Amino acid sequence: VNFAIQTNGLMIDEQWAVFLAENRFLVGISIDGIKALHDELRPDAFGRSTWARVTKALSLLQKNKVDTNILCVVTRSCAKSPVKVYHTLQKLGGNYLQFTPCLDPLGKPRGSMPYSITPELYGHFLCGLFDEWYRDWQAG
């Protein structure tokens, strides 16, 4: 049996990190690209930045040898900076990176919401991301 959870990481502390490590969880942490974009999209209940707390939770999980997946929701704003997003998330050091397109609500035209992404823009983002990853891979 394998366990996996997805979280914003705000409630992860040492005790949780130890529990997740001992029980061999894969923990997905939601981090939406660069700091400014993440904080715009994922403020706390008081409208404050969550970047430092989320990245601290990720570090705590890594310190305890928990497998981690960084999930980035690709919004229209995020899609404009695939290279910056790649390097920001790669430096955080998750075991896996996952890029999920931000879609419109059902029944709405594609790309009609200010945050949603069209298939073309998502494809452009993924190609830019791949190209940068490939350059890194070639460089060793």
Label for each model-derived stretch:
Residues 40-52, 59, 63-140:
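Radical SAM enzyme [4Fe-4S]-AdoMet core and its adjacent flexible, acidic
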Residues 1-27, 31-37, 44-56, 72-84:
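Canonical radical SAM enzyme core domain
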